[in-house]
Amino acid sequence: MEGDLTDMHVKIVSAVRSGNDYNNQPTVLVTYEWTNNTGKNNSFAVLANPKVFQNGQELDTAMYLDNPEDYDSGSYLSELQPGATGTVTLGYVLKDDSEVTVDVTNLLDFSDTAKVTYKFAI
């Protein structure tokens, strides 16, 4: 699923089971592709508010001792120039084996009027 938010275009590429976190809990690795549609350099962290839910509950962000395959720990904070497209990977701690819902909204839009969302089986 993909769509336009206020200052960016975002695509939720995938959500796949990944390595365990530092607490040996199972995780899901979500990959986002985004384009900076502002007039200045920006990062995904500054523009987007990504959240992942399972059974209606928000999942905690995963912290890894050893980075799993395809995980780029710096991608969330890396800046893109205007018009550039990049990839962000974020891990989340799973509660069980049920599907996850990935939502991306504007960071400072509390009405959630612009939202990109998709459900993934784990």
Language-model segment annotations:
Residues 13-18, 71-76, 87-88:
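Short structured motifs
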Residues 121-122:
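Short, solvent-exposed mixed-charge patches
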Residues 1-25:
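Low-complexity, acidic Ser/Thr/Pro/Gly-rich terminal tails and inter-domain linkers that flank the onset
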Residues 87-118:
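Short, surface-exposed ligand- or partner-binding patches at beta-edge/loop junctions that are enriched
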Residues 28-30, 86:
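Hydrophobic core residues within well-ordered beta-strands of beta-rich domains
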Residues 23, 35-84:
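The feature marks short-to-medium sequence segments in extracytoplasmic or secretory-pathway proteins
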Residues 11, 51-53, 101-103:
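Beta-strand signatures of extracellular beta-sandwich domains
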